[in-house]
Amino acid sequence: METYVNKLHEGSTYTAAVQYNVLEKDDDPASLTIWVPMFQSSMPADLLIKELANVNILVKQISTPKGPSLRVMINSRSAVLAQMPSKFTICANVSLDERSKLAYDVTTPCEIKACSLTCLKSKNMLTTVKDLTMKTLNPTHDIIALCEFENIVTSKKVIIPTYLRSISVRNKDLNTLENITTTEFKNAITNAKIIPYSGLLLVITVTDNKGAFKYIKPQSQFIVDLGAYLEKESIYYVTTNWKHTATRFAIKPMED
C-alpha cells in the first residue's frame, strides 16, 4: 500500500482531506476512488496516516436523485479516527474507474491500494467558489485564474482555467480593473497546488484580500474542484511531479 501526506498547513489543528484508491474484493473487482468528507483533526499527520491505512472499507452502489452513487462505510477501532465520518455517500460517476464491474445494491469489502492525507487550514480559513458566488449582486463579469502547472519529469505544461468568482463592473471601470489585475491578483496569490481529493482539487493560498478577493480572509486557502483534469494520474504522480509555475488572470463578460 502507498501512503502520502501533503502538508499545506502546519498548524496544530487542520482540515483533513483524505482520499483512497481501493480495489473490490470479489471475482470481478472494480477499481474505485473514495474521498472522505473533510474533517477537523489535531492529530499529528504522520500518526493519522498510519491509522487511515488500517481501516476496513465497504462500498455499495446505490441510486439517488443525483444519479449513481456509492455508499461508503469505514470501520476502525482507533480513537485517533473518532472525528472522521464513517458513513457517507459520494458520486459514482466520479469515483468509478471501472463502473461496469460494480454490482448494484451489493455491499462489498475493499482492499486499500493507496491513501492520501492533505492537511489544509482549519474550516474557517477555507473558501470555495460557491462561498464567493453567493456574495455577488447583479454580476456582469467572471474572473478566471489561468493556473499553469508543469510535469517536472516530462516538462509538459498544462494550463487549467479556474473560475474564481463573478463581479459587477460598470463599463467605465472595466479598463481600470483590467489594468490592476496583473499586479493586484499576482500579489494576492502566492502559490497553487494540485491535491488528490474528489478527483483533484486546486488549492490557492491568498495572501492579500483586496479587490476580487475582498471576501476571502488573508492567508486563507481557496479551494477549486478541477473535475476531470489529470484524473488518470495516480496519487503519487500528481503529488510528486506536478508543480505550479505561474498564474495569470482574465476578466470575461458573463455569457448568457
Curated annotation (Swiss-Prot):
Keyword hit for Membrane: yes
Name recorded for this polypeptide: Matrix protein
Pfam family, one: Matrix_Pneumo_N
Gene name in the database record: M
Keyword Membrane among UniProt keywords: yes
UniProt region (Interaction with M2-1), positions on chain: 1-110
One GO CC term, this protein: viral tegument
Post-translational modification: Phosphorylation is important for oligomerization.
Annotated InterPro entries: Matrix_Pneumo_C, MATRX_N_pneumovirus, Pneu_matrix_N
GO molecular function, one term: structural constituent of virion
Keywords: Host cell membrane, Host cytoplasm, Host membrane, Host nucleus, Host-virus interaction, Membrane, Phosphoprotein, Viral matrix protein, Virion
Function: Plays a crucial role in virus assembly into filaments and budding. Early in infection, localizes in the nucleus where it inhibits host cell transcription through direct binding to host chromatin. Later in infection, traffics to the cytoplasm through the action of host CRM1 to associate with inclusion bodies, the site of viral transcription and replication. During virus assembly and budding, acts as a bridge between the nucleocapsid and the lipid bilayer. Also plays a role in the inhibition of host interferon-beta response in a RACK1-dependent manner.
Protein's cellular compartments: Virion; Host cytoplasm; Host nucleus; Host cell membrane
Phosphothreonine modified-residue sites: T205
GO biological process: virion assembly
Membrane topology: Peripheral membrane protein
Family named by the database record: Belongs to the pneumovirinae M protein family.
Start and end residues of each stretch annotated as Nuclear targeting and binding to host importin KPNB1: 110-183
Quaternary structure annotation from Swiss-Prot or TrEMBL: Forms dimers. Forms higher-order oligomers. Interacts with glycoprotein G (via N-terminus). Interacts with protein M2-1; this interaction directs the matrix protein localization to cytoplasmic inclusions comprising viral proteins L, N, P, and M2-1 and mediates the matrix protein association with the nucleocapsid. Interacts with host importin KPNB1; this interaction mediates nuclear import of the matrix protein early during infection. Interacts with host AP3M1; this interaction plays an essential role in trafficking the matrix protein in host cells.
Motif (Nuclear export signal): 194-206
